[in-house]
Design a protein with these regions (language model features):
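Carbohydrate-binding surfaces of carbohydrate-active enzymes
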Residues: 1-321
Length: 321
């Protein structure tokens, strides 16, 4: 998503129960002073990921047609998406009516401005004869066509018959999908340890390429070494601080550190990077007697809610309150 329209400004007196949430809330929202920082952050990131081209690894065939033909046996597409997300293999979901006219060249096919070296077809019993014919042709031209579980039977929508031949391609299991794609060279991000909550987005502009890294884990930080297609001439961009920082590389990879829900952008080329990104470290302090959490209700100046915590914890945890 690269375009946002803030809409939660309400001119009615606060609270207007018919129109939550309220960004400003006539001065009653204690987070409103930080709203400008959030909008600046969103503007910077949105600017970087529009007007260019997304660089995915593979394409997934949209599964609606297979589900309409046989809902009981069709594999939910989100199962495939989850497996790819957890392995840092980026993808686009392509509808069948776009795919059947996609040209093939140099062992890749084109859809819009993007090219793909592989098509993944989630588990289904049937597929239209037109799609089967495209898969057979693309496979013969070097595109990796992967069917999960079993190859679907081709069906002619007009005659409701199953003509032959069956679609070309390779049948792989869901469990073997990730390693199959990696063996085919269709994975550009590799971590030194599994990172199921790490997401990335590779994007190209006329003046260079970037990779967005995001930690989807709401609780745990990510710290690992990541291999990217950029090589050693790279730097970090922090969109919240609007700063460039030289990247810390080691053993052919870059050191990545992300707090929960944090995003950092890796930039090809290190022009403008002034300093090495280093986390601030201090001697640990063990407080005596636990922690006191104070909360000030909206519209007041003094805390009226106090909680005694034996240890410092995630203040956003739903079971804390």
């Amino acid at each position: 998503i690269n375009a946002f329209v803030p809409h939660a400004f309400d001119l009615a007196a606060f609270p207007d129960e018919d129109c939550p949430p309220h960004f400003y809330a006539w001065g009653n929202n204690p987070q409103f002073p930080f709203f400008r920082q959030l909008m600046d952050y969103m503007n910077r990131v949105s600017h970087l990921i529009q007007g260019g081209r997304h660089i995915p690894c593979v394409a997934l065939l949209y599964s609606a047609e297979g589900e309409w033909m046989d809902r009981e046996s069709a594999q939910p597409l989100e199962e495939v998406c989850l497996a790819l997300n957890r392995a840092q293999i980026d993808y686009e979901i392509i509808p069948g009516d776009v795919l059947v006219s996609a040209p093939v060249e140099n062992r890749r096919f084109r859809a819009g401005e993007e090219t793909f070296g592989a098509l993944i077809v989630s588990g289904r019993r049937f597929m239209s004869a037109q799609l089967c014919a495209w898969c057979q042709s693309a496979s013969a031209q070097g595109v990796s066509v992967l069917f999960l579980g079993a190859a679907p039977a081709p069906v002619d929508p007009a005659a409701m018959e199953a003509p032959h031949p069956a679609p070309g391609g390779t049948v792989v299991s869901q469990e073997a999908l990730v390693e199959t794609l990696r063996s085919l060279g269709l994975s550009e991000i590799r971590c030194d340890a599994p990172q199921p909550y790490l997401r990335y987005y590779h994007y190209a502009q006329e003046d260079g390429e970037i990779i967005l890294f995001f930690n989807e884990d709401p609780v745990h930080a990510i710290e690992c070494r990541v291999r990217t297609p950029f090589g050693a001439d790279i730097c970090w961009y922090d969109p919240w601080l609007n700063e460039l920082a030289a990247a810390e590389t080691e053993d052919g990879g870059v050191r990545l550190r992300l707090s929960p829900y944090q995003m950092m952008i890796l930039k090809a080329g290190n022009s403008g990077a002034k300093r090495l990104w280093q986390p601030e470290k201090a001697a640990p302090v063990e407080p005596e007697g636990g922690w006191t959490l104070s909360m000030i209700p909206a519209g007041e100046t003094e805390p009226s809610v106090r909680l005694n915590l034996p240890a410092l914890t995630n203040l956003c945890a739903p079971d804390l309150y």
